[in-house]
Design a protein with these regions (language model features):
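Short alpha-helical linear motifs
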Residues: 2-6, 90-98, 150-152
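Acidic/His metal-coordination segments adjacent to aromatic residues that form catalytic metal sites
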Residues: 4, 9-42, 104-141
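Internal, conserved structured core segments that host functional sites
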Residues: 31-83
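Structural signal for well-ordered, non-membrane alpha-helices
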Residues: 55, 77, 81-84, 88, ...
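Long, hydrophobic, amphipathic alpha-helical segments used as structural scaffolds
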Residues: 58-61, 84-87, 91-94, 142-145, ...
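Glycine- and acidic-residue-rich phosphate-binding/metal-coordinating active-site segment common to enzymes
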Residues: 60-127
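Extended, helix-rich structural scaffolds rather than catalytic motifs
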Residues: 99-314
């Protein structure tokens, strides 16, 4: 609070802003957002981490923090709405173009790209990237800092008020995955120390909902393809999985195997260049780019030609 608080806030902003000389500590916030699909994936997956953290801080015993976070959650909800519907409309456009062209094989990538839409395997690769980067935002699976914050009443668990326990966790345990002898195992850890792990599990469950809706779009279009979340150890830079290479199915693989197959799991420069080639502006009301379907309804149920922004010249 006061002058000390302002100084600390300025230093926090400096640390968080990032630059070429001092990049942000977390990879998700160093990743470029060169196209709309990247933006939609960021708002769906990375902003969802913000939702989980804000929900936990909304349980704080420090009332100003709790009330502030509850207000901020309304903004996060809109971010994730933009992300889910944006990715969904991209998938819808691809499905419609494939059906119109009579293409049934989702892996006929060149033919699908020639239609001016983004092929489904590339969308899956973008999903893999942003999901795995977002998992790193939860920090170490076992954390004394998280335990201390919980004990101090600064931060609770996700939807703490719905959990039916003593809310002290003194003698409780929680399952945490570990790497032992080059195998993934599950160990029971003190629940207090596994606060981050539990929050990450809640995130995974929450994030899966959008994938189910995207897959229903493909099912209605009779396209044999389904989006999946990769294993939580895939492409990780923070936590117990960071020292090893793990494929999307959860198998520990060698560095050479990773190097030879990473391009089939994560977007390449050529994938990015193709997506960028589709990013052409449309200036007329009701006109949409080839790679994205029109929205079902406008924001706040407004018509397609509604002027959301009005410019008044002085």
């Amino acid at each position: 609070f006061g002058a000390d608080g302002r100084e600390e806030a300025n230093m926090l902003l400096r640390r968080s802003s990032g630059s070429d000389d001092a990049p942000r500590m977390l990879g998700a916030f160093n990743e470029e957002t060169p196209d709309w699909l990247s933006f939609f994936m960021f708002t769906y997956f990375t902003d969802r981490d913000g939702k989980m953290q804000l929900e936990s801080l909304a349980q704080s015993g420090f009332d100003p923090l709790s009330r502030t976070c509850r207000f901020m959650l309304t903004e996060e909800a809109h971010h994730m709405f933009v992300g889910e519907t944006g990715v969904g409309r991209t998938i819808q456009a691809t499905a419609e173009a494939m059906n119109k062209a009579g293409i049934t094989d989702p892996y006929d990538i060149n033919a699908i790209r020639d239609l001016g839409v983004i092929d489904l395997p590339t969308i899956q690769k973008k999903l893999n990237l942003h999901y795995s980067l977002s998992l790193d935002l939860f920090g170490q699976e076992v954390s004394t800092n998280a335990a201390n914050a919980f004990n101090a009443g600064i931060k609770g668990r996700y939807m703490e008020h719905r959990l039916e326990d003593d809310h002290k966790l003194s003698n409780d345990t929680y399952n945490v995955k570990m790497i032992k002898d080059n195998h993934i195992i599950t160990e029971q850890m003190p629940a207090l120390n596994a606060i981050n792990m539990r929050l990450r599990d809640d995130y995974v469950n929450d994030a899966s909902g959008g994938l189910n809706r995207w897959n229903r779009t493909l099912k209605r279009a009779n396209i044999d393809f389904a989006f999946t979340l990769p294993h939580e150890g895939f492409n990780r830079s923070i936590g117990v999985f960071s020292p090893v290479s793990i494929d999307p199915q959860g198998n520990i693989i060698s560095i050479d195997e990773w190097a030879s197959q990473a391009s089939s799991w994560l977007p390449t420069k050529s994938d990015g260049a193709f997506i960028q080639s589709l990013m052409k502006p449309c200036f007329e009301a009701g006109e949409y780019a080839s790679w994205i379907a029109p929205p079902k309804v406008g924001i706040n149920n407004q018509p397609g030609d509604f002027e959301y922004v009005q410019l008044h010249m002085a």
